[in-house]
Amino acid sequence: MESVARVGPLGVRFWDFAEERFVADGLIVRVGLASGGSRITATAGESGIFTARGLPGLNVIEFGDTAAGYWSTTTTKSYVVEVHDPAGRFLPFSFPARLPARGLFVWTCALSPPSSGLSDGVPLFSAPSRPAASMRGVIRAQLQDAATGGDAAGAVLVATIAGSATVTGIADARGRVAIVMPYPEPSDFPIIGSSPPVVPVGSSLAAYSWPVTLAAQYGRITPYPPYPDLCTTLRQPGATLLGDASGSPLPTQTLRMGVELVVRSVDVATGSALPVLLVRAP
C-alpha cells in the first residue's frame, strides 16, 4: 500500500552553553535557498525543535511515498539557515544545510577544541549584551586587530579553565566578546551545583578561583555580514593574543567566583591596562 506523507525537510534545535539546555523561545529562524530568494520562517514545537515546511525548491519533494525508498532517491539542495535573537541574548549567525534532511539535523562543523557541554544541536553563542544569570562565570574582552587598530569582528576566543573545561565565544561586529558559562565545580566543593548553593561551614563561594588560558582564532572576515556563517567563523586560523603592544604573549588569567573577568592588554609605557585585548592575525 502506498504511504504518502508530507515530509518535514528540516528539524533542528539549538544548544545554549551558558544554561546547558536547548533554547527555542524568542529565536527567529529563517530558511532559504543558498542561491538566494525568499526565506521561510521555521516554527518550534513543544520539544524545542524548529521545523520548516513549504521551502522554495522542495514543494514537490515534501510529498512522497515514504515506504518506497523515499530517502534513497531524493535529491538534496543547498540551503542557508539564519538565526536571530531579538532579545539580544545570542549572536546572529547562519549555517549551510543540505535539505531535505532525514531525522534531526546534524551540525557537522565541530568546535576545535571541543567545547565542554556541547550537546546534540547547533550551538548558540552569547552576545556581549547578554546579562549573566546567577552562578555563571563571565569572561569579556574588546578584541582589537593589533595590525590595523580596527575591531576584530568575528574573532573566536577560546578559554581553557583549570586545564580542563574549554568554552568558546565569538566577537560581534564591534569586536566585543562575552563567554558565559557555568563555573567549574571545585574538587573540594562538590555541592556547588545545588540550588541554592549550600556553603559548608567556614567556606566562602567568593574564595574560589580558577586559572584561565586564552587562545584565539582570527582571519579578518571582511566585510562582516549580518548573519556570519558559523562554520566559516569557527574555522578561522589560529591567532595570537598579546599581553601588550610589544608582542608579549597574553599571560594566564584568573577567573574568580562572582566577578566578571575582563581581559585587556597592557600599555607598555605606563603598565596600565588598555581598554582592548590585542589580537594578531597570522
Positions of PLM-derived features:
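Short, acidic Ser/Thr/Gly-rich low-complexity loop/linker segments typical of extracellular
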Residues: 34-65, 164-186
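Hydrophilic extracytoplasmic domains
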Residues: 222-282
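Beta-strand-rich domain onsets/edges
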Residues: 1-23, 97-139, 144-150, 169, ...
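Short, ordered, surface-exposed loop/turn motifs in non-cytosolic proteins
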Residues: 19-35, 148-162
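A short, solvent-exposed loop/turn motif at the edges and junctions
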Residues: 62-110, 187-236
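Exposed beta-strand and adjacent loop surfaces of beta-rich binding modules
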Residues: 9-11, 26-28, 78, 138, ...
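Long, positively charged binding patches that form subdomain-scale interaction surfaces
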Residues: 130-213
